[in-house]
Swiss-Prot record:
UniProt cross-references to PROSITE patterns, sorted A to Z: PA2_ASP, PA2_HIS
Similarity field: Belongs to the phospholipase A2 family.
Proregion positions: 16-22
EC number: 3.1.1.4
Catalyzed chemical reaction(s): a 1,2-diacyl-sn-glycero-3-phosphocholine + H2O = a 1-acyl-sn-glycero-3-phosphocholine + a fatty acid + H(+); 1,2-ditetradecanoyl-sn-glycero-3-phosphocholine + H2O = 1-tetradecanoyl-sn-glycero-3-phosphocholine + tetradecanoate + H(+); 1,2-dihexadecanoyl-sn-glycero-3-phosphocholine + H2O = 1-hexadecanoyl-sn-glycero-3-phosphocholine + hexadecanoate + H(+); 1-hexadecanoyl-2-(9Z-octadecenoyl)-sn-glycero-3-phosphocholine + H2O = 1-hexadecanoyl-sn-glycero-3-phosphocholine + (9Z)-octadecenoate + H(+)
Name used for this protein in its record: Phospholipase A2
One annotated Gene Ontology cellular component of this protein: secretory granule
PANTHER family with a match to the protein in the record: PHOSPHOLIPASE A2, PHOSPHOLIPASE A2 FAMILY MEMBER
Active site annotation, chain numbering: 70, 121
Length: 146
């Protein structure tokens, strides 16, 4: 999960900024679908070694492993021909999906890049909902523990 990558994208221009803001907000809403009442940007950003900008070392728990898997999924998405441009990449692209109850369904109208990214975010949101949140790993000193 590269939620803070938004800051890095600000230098890419106004268009990338507005799109990346929507992409981050969209992932946030997907997490809220699987975990109603959560505050994803506050709770999951800077958690463990992988939740937030960057990621290295050994995940500290199952939630951190969800973030590591999400990072790897985005790395795979970037290898797709349809996900290589600034506007069409995992950190800036948006997609269509539905939330019904706690079930997320990615739209079959998404293009290849959008579909891949939607499923990366969907799997991460589902993963987050199935594992415990350990407060001691929030704002972890990654230089020391990762």
């Amino acid at each position: 999960m590269k939620l803070l990558l938004l800051a890095a994208l600000l230098t890419a221009g106004v268009t990338a900024h507005s799109i990346s803001t929507r992409a981050v907000w969209q992932f946030r809403n997907m997490i809220k679908c699987t975990i109603p009442g959560s505050d994803p940007l506050r709770e999951y950003n800077n958690y463990g070694c992988y939740c937030g900008l960057g990621g290295s070392g050994t995940p500290v728990d199952d939630l951190d492993r969800c973030c590591q898997t999400h990072d790897h999924c985005y790395n795979q998405a970037k290898k797709l021909e349809s996900c290589k441009f600034l506007i069409d990449n995992p950190y800036t692209n948006t997609y269509s999906y539905k939330c019904s109850g706690n079930v997320i369904t990615c739209s079959d109208k998404n293009n290849d890049c959008e579909s891949f990214i939607c499923n990366c975010d969907r799997q991460a949101a589902i993963c987050f909902s199935k594992v415990p949140y350990n407060k001691e790993y929030k704002d972890l000193d990654t230089k020391k523990h990762c």
